[in-house]
Regions:
Chain A
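Active-site-flanking alpha-helical
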Residues: 104, 263-267, 342
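Iron-sulfur-associated redox domains of electron-transfer enzymes in respiratory
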Residues: 1-236
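Extended amphipathic alpha-helical segments enriched in small hydrophobics
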Residues: 248-259
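A donor-sugar binding/catalytic signature common to diverse glycosyltransferases
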Residues: 257-273
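Ferredoxin-type iron-sulfur electron-transfer modules in oxidoreductases and energy-metabolism complexes
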Residues: 225-250, 268-373
């Protein structure tokens, strides 16, 4: 199924039910002020009217807590490790926003870099998880994907992109897996190929909605002109030494809301937990906002105050990750940290402050920088 | 601009111009609807950015303790009590603190507003008297302030600041009018198993970002017990025992000190009703020991007082 198909919106639950054969299907569900991915239940139906999920879907591929292996400390098995079986079930996430899909594509480059460093847990879950995106027609006030190499109808990281056209839904395949999935959909409901006059009209409507969504961000006081260009021209040391950081960090509470709700933050901590004669090695999300994150065994802490920790988060997103990823920002512009930060520290304002300060900073040193994370 | 904001600016500009303080801690407009941002104004010009809305839901006493210098702080009833707390706990000297007293009509709950909008995006909120007008691209809806107030503000017992070096407005009725003991009935009528079930369910969605801890003006340990690594007192996982232990210990650290300011609940990204635990502590301190936290600089903290006829119910 190479071409896009148009379905009646009323057929979406039927399609999801069909996709659910042999897979767990998750959809965004809103309860009160929170929206979260939940198992699709045809009886509860679904809504395509949600901004984005409160938390990012990253925990589907990178769980907050994950057992990596088990070991024994006593007896004949002492010192032996057994890797935890990789048992990722087949899943399909419907309604992933393009920003979050872009984050998955970005994290692929962190967790699956080469044969020697592939993270098998991420890779297997990624392989067994199909992503059907839902294009954004009405971005939130906090959205800025267009400034972060993304767009409200972008397809990076997705298998299919769905676009809500009101009474109809346009499904566009992105990958081979997406094409196979679209064929399944066409068996469950009647899909009209998006060609000819009717198809042209639907594609035109989708295009209008894309432009409308982009216009919303273009009208925002925070998005136009947002660029990493000056930051990229300056050395790491220059950006590091900018005078802006204490003021930005001043009202930060140093909680982990920004990092834990962020779709691209991926730092973790590995711990061995032992009880009696056995134990497990477990990986948990960690946050650079925490004092403990960089505490050395010696007692020294290279990031002793919140100023260094806050700087680290923005340096990672806007300097280190672009250095490692050929210029791609480490942020996808989903706006969650803007929405959720208890102190309303707005990453868009921070980037703008970095940009302005980089423009007027004295020339960078000639010593080349090495990217770090 | 509302009268409160205008008056706060006047006071802050005067304090800074006369060099009576080095900085004024208050709020400025948020970057998105239904938000206000903590802000440290250091010049009269910066003080012109200060504002006051129903979305000043953090607790500035949290930031006041770490800023240094002579500081003026905009404080509602609860925040003024927490300022008493940080003075009592020697985290800030009274002579370095100027309280800009803000009689409080109760702060608003952005989640309640979002819930009532059922999916429609909010672009602005206007507050006039007892009315809150919520606007969007193609709608405008008016609510009574009580309908969208935070729960803790509905049952507030002390809306007027207990310290007042500068005053923003005339006093308001002292209480929010609601029944503060209602919330703990949730626990009291339940058998232990059902209590534990409710406790478990309440914190099920916790992501351990510690926003509740970090928003709280009571926390003062140099190294929080959850960050202790030698020995490590608490596991890092999302497993129930780790999550529940964190919440239980955090709550106990607030015993006799919690002012029910609601900052923890407002900060939680998962929408967890944090006050279910802390309100029980507040209630025990008040009903069993006749103690309300930090009402004056002279009152002794509940945990610093022992009397042979103290009730024992607290252990049951």
């Amino acid at each position: 199924m190479d071409e896009a198909l148009i379905f009646s919106r009323l057929d979406v639950p039927r399609i999801l039910t069909a996709w659910g054969a042999g897979r767990a299907v998750y959809i965004p569900e809103t309860a009160g002020a929170q929206t979260a991915f939940a198992l699709f239940n045809p009886e509860r139906g679904l809504s395509l009217h949600f901004g984005n999920t409160t938390l990012s879907p990253k925990s589907f591929l990178f769980p907050q807590t994950e057992c990596l292996l088990r070991f024994a400390t006593r007896g004949p098995e002492a010192g032996l490790c057994q890797t935890e079986p990789l048992g990722a079930q087949k899943r399909l996430l419907f309604g992933v926003r393009p920003c979050d899909a872009a984050a998955f594509a970005l994290l692929d480059r962190v967790f699956v870099q080469d044969d020697r460093s592939t993270d098998p847990f991420w890779a297997l879950r990624r392989e067994r998880t199909l992503l059907v995106g839902l294009a954004c027609n009405s971005p939130d006030e906090t959205c800025f994907c267009t400034a972060m190499d993304g767009g409200p109808h972008n397809t990076a990281g997705l298998d299919i992109l769905a676009c809500d056209l009101g009474d109809e839904v346009l499904l566009r395949p992105v990958t081979d897996r997406g094409r196979a999935l679209l064929a399944e959909a066409a068996q469950a409901a009647t899909g009209v190929p998006a060609r000819g006059e009717r198809g042209g009209a639907a594609l035109g409507q989708a295009e209008t909605r894309r432009m409308g969504a982009e216009a919303v961000m273009a009208r925002s006081p925070f998005v136009p002109g947002l660029t990493l260009e000056a930051v990229s021209r300056r050395s790491q040391r220059t950006v590091h030494a900018l005078g802006i950081w204490p003021r930005i960090a001043e009202t930060c509470l140093n909680c982990g809301v920004c990092t834990f709700t962020c779709p691209t933050c991926h730092c973790f901590d590995i711990q061995d937990e032992t009880k009696g004669g056995s134990g497990r090695r477990v990986r948990n999300w960690d946050t650079c906002m925490s004092w403990l994150f960089t505490a050395h065994a010696s007692g020294h802490n290279p990031r002793p105050t919140k100023v260094e920790r806050v700087r680290q988060r923005f340096m990672h997103k806007f300097k280190y990750m672009p250095m490692n990823l050929g210029g791609r920002p480490g942020c996808v512009g989903c706006g969650r940290c803007v929405r959720q930060c208890p102190a309303n520290i707005d990453i868009r304002e921070v980037l703008r402050a970095m940009d302005m300060a980089c423009r007027i900073a004295p020339p960078s040193s000639l010593i080349p920088d090495e990217a770090v994370s | 601009m509302n009268a409160y904001a205008r008056r706060i600016r006047e006071i802050a500009q005067r304090l800074l111009a006369e060099k009576r303080v080095d900085a004024v801690l208050g709020y400025r407009a948020g970057t998105v609807p239904m938000r206000a941002r903590p802000f440290v104004a250091r010049t009269p010009a910066e003080a012109g950015e200060l504002t006051w809305t129903g979305f000043c839901v953090g607790n500035l006493a949290r930031l006041a303790a770490g800023l240094g210098g002579r500081l003026a702080v905009c404080a509602q009833g609860c925040v003024s009590r927490n300022l008493v707390g940080i003075v009592r706990e020697n985290r800030l000297r009274r002579e370095d603190l100027t309280v800009i007293a803000v009689p409080c009509l109760g702060m608003l709950d952005a989640r309640k507003i979002v819930t009532r909008m059922s999916g429609r995006a909010v672009t602005g909120v206007r507050e006039e008297g007892d009315e809150v007008t919520v606007t969007g691209a193609d709608f405008e809806e008016v609510f009574g302030r009580g309908d969208v107030k935070r729960d803790n503000c509905l049952t507030c017992l002390h809306r007027n600041p207990v310290l007042a070096d500068e005053v923003v407005a005339d006093p308001v009725p002292e209480t929010g009018g609601g029944d503060i003991d209602k919330l703990i009935e949730l626990w009291e009528r339940k058998k232990p198993e059902a209590r534990f079930e409710l406790f478990t369910r309440t914190f099920r969605d916790c992501i351990r970002c510690y926003a509740c801890r970090d928003a709280c003006p009571l926390c003062h340990c140099a190294t929080c017990f959850v960050n202790r690594s030698n020995p490590q007192w608490l596991g890092k996982t999302q497993d129930e025992p780790d999550v529940l232990t964190y919440h239980l210990l955090r709550a106990f650290h607030c015993a006799g000190r919690c002012t029910d300011c609601g900052a923890c609940e407002s900060a939680c990204p998962a929408g967890i009703p944090m006050r279910r635990l802390t309100s029980k502590l507040e209630s025990d301190a008040r009903r069993l020991f006749g103690h309300e936290a930090f009402l004056s600089l002279d009152a002794k903290p509940a945990l610093a007082v022992f009397s042979p006829d103290d009730p024992d119910e607290v252990f049951s």
